[in-house]
């Protein structure tokens, strides 16, 4: 695929606007239009969907989303150098691209959505990717304002997102992600597809929010998983002491063997312990 629209090639856009990637902003630009189109398609039909894109840079994925038929794209970009390039795309797709010059970590899109169907699709800046994902997974109330996320991460982070009990990568992020969403790694992207090429493989992950996750206080769940995984090699009867209650009694009340280690406990087990923690502290 040489072009998806009649706008200039991305390499020309980079030169025109002096948009060479900055490591300080976690930027790795994806120039391959086959791949940007594949990411856009992974988000499903978009003709009645508003897409939130974080860190669009020169706009390769932005163009793919619009060309694929997204009703509207709200692009949040911190790098002021990218704004003129994005404005050029907005002129090509009048009324369909809204550009927000700001910090994605503090951006709340809900006032702009007005009840519209929304999805988050992004090649996330690697230096804030986990922070952003954790924030989206922590939205209250749940289900959230978005019905899907299709996001690119470093492969190691992607493995942590989809991990479940007894997986080597299983940890706090995997518990939160799979408690609140169905997760799947869709495909990998090699370093050579990016400019500059990162040192590791990247992966595109889909997260579909669960309509009714197991009933639990998110804060209590975070407390339990933090205690358990901060000392992941220790048995729960040791690691859960940080919670300020009898750890063995907590685990047993939740139906979890207190001699188990965090990496072997299911999400349902952590939810049960979080619920018992609230009762014990009441």
Swiss-Prot record:
Q: What is its main location?
A: cytoplasm
Q: Give this protein's Gene Ontology molecular function annotations.
A: 16S rRNA (adenine(1518)-N(6)/adenine(1519)-N(6))-dimethyltransferase activity; RNA binding
Sites binding S-adenosyl-L-methionine sit at: 28, 30, 55, 77, 103, 123
* Gene Ontology CC entries for this record: cytosol
SMART domains, per this entry? Answer: rADc
From the record, give the transmembrane residue ranges: none
Broad enzyme group: transferase
Stated EC number for the protein is: 2.1.1.182
Which Pfam family, giving just one, matches this sequence?
Answer: RrnaAD
Say which family it is in: Belongs to the class I-like SAM-binding methyltransferase superfamily. rRNA adenine N(6)-methyltransferase family. RsmA subfamily.
The free-text function statement in the UniProt record for this protein reads:
Specifically dimethylates two adjacent adenosines (A1518 and A1519) in the loop of a conserved hairpin near the 3'-end of 16S rRNA in the 30S particle. May play a critical role in biogenesis of 30S subunits.
Instruction: State the protein's name.
Output: Ribosomal RNA small subunit methyltransferase A
Source organism of the structure? Afipia carboxidovorans (strain ATCC 49405 / DSM 1227 / KCTC 32145 / OM5)
């Amino acid at each position: 695929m040489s072009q998806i629209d009649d706008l200039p090639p991305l390499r020309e856009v980079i030169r025109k606007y002096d948009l060479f990637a900055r490591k300080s902003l976690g930027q790795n630009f994806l120039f391959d239009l086959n791949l940007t189109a594949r990411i856009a398609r992974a988000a499903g039909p978009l003709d009645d969907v508003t897409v939130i894109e974080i860190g669009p840079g020169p706009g390769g994925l932005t163009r793919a989303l619009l060309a694929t038929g997204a009703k509207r794209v709200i692009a949040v970009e911190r790098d002021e150098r990218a704004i003129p390039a994005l404005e050029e795309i907005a002129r090509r797709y009048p009324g369909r691209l809204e550009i927000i010059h700001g910090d994605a970590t503090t951006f709340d899109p809900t006032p702009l959505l007005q009840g519209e169907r929304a999805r988050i699709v992004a090649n996330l800046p690697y230096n804030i990717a986990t922070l952003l994902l954790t924030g989206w997974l922590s939205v209250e109330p749940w289900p959230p304002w978005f019905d899907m996320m299709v996001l690119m991460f470093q492969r190691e982070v992607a493995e942590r997102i989809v991990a479940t009990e007894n997986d080597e990568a299983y940890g706090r992020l995997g518990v939160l992600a799979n408690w609140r969403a169905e997760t799947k790694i869709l495909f990998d992207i090699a370093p050579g597809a990016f400019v500059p090429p990162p040192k590791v493989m990247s992966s595109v992950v889909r997260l579909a929010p669960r309509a009714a996750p197991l009933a639990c206080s998110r804060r209590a769940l975070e407390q339990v998983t933090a205690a358990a995984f901060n000392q992941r090699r220790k048995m729960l009867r040791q690691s859960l002491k940080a919670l300020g209650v009898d750890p063995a009694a907590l685990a047993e009340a939740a139906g979890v063997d207190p001699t188990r280690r965090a990496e072997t406990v299911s999400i349902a087990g952590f939810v049960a312990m979080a619920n018992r923690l609230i009762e014990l502290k009441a």
